[in-house]
């Protein structure tokens, strides 16, 4: 009798995890590349003399980036202590989407726009420390040989952004 080993399959969650990360990175890099130019030319900083707008826009940009890289501490702590990786990634992804809604709705309202940037930084920070390990958690000993393929794709997506 010829028995073959069962073929291990790719976990069905993987495309969704990679897709979520691709959207998050695309969004972050898109905002990062145009935020200063947008702020200089928009009504958000119209109260500042034109000669000082670029400096003020860079201050906003750097505050946003600091938030993006500070909030992973909060996201990791919440996942480890209270909610787990899945729930934390899910809810912080929704916070991220709410931030984009604020940017779209409040393009000419300073408080609404800054709230959107804050929510995006919070959402990005909540996702950042968890998504790689959450991706790895989807594999068992039966399909761990597929993990290299997935992580190659995962890091390609992150860097392609």
Predicted regions and their residues:
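Central cavity-lining transmembrane alpha-helices of secondary-active solute carriers
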Residues: 58-80, 128, 160
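Intracellular juxtamembrane helix-capping segments at the cytosolic ends
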Residues: 126-142
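C-terminal ends and interior cores of transmembrane alpha-helices
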Residues: 89-115, 122
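Short amphipathic helix-loop junctions that connect adjacent transmembrane helices
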Residues: 33-58
């Amino acid at each position: 009798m010829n028995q073959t080993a069962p073929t291990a399959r790719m976990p069905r969650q993987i495309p969704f995890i990679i897709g979520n990360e691709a959207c998050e990175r695309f969004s972050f890099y898109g905002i990062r590349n145009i935020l200063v130019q947008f702020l200089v030319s928009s009504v958000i900083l119209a109260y500042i003399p034109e000669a000082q707008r670029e400096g003020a826009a860079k201050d906003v940009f750097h505050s946003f980036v600091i938030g993006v890289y500070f909030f992973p501490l909060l996201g990791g702590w919440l996942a480890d202590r209270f909610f787990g990786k899945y729930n934390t990634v899910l809810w912080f992804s929704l916070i991220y989407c709410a931030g984009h809604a604020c940017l779209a709705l409040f393009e000419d309202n300073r408080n609404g726009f800054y709230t959107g940037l804050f929510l995006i930084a919070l959402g990005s920070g909540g996702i950042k420390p968890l998504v790689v390990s959450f991706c790895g958690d989807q594999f068992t000993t039966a399909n761990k040989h597929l993990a290299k393929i997935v992580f190659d794709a995962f890091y390609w997506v992150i860097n392609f952004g």
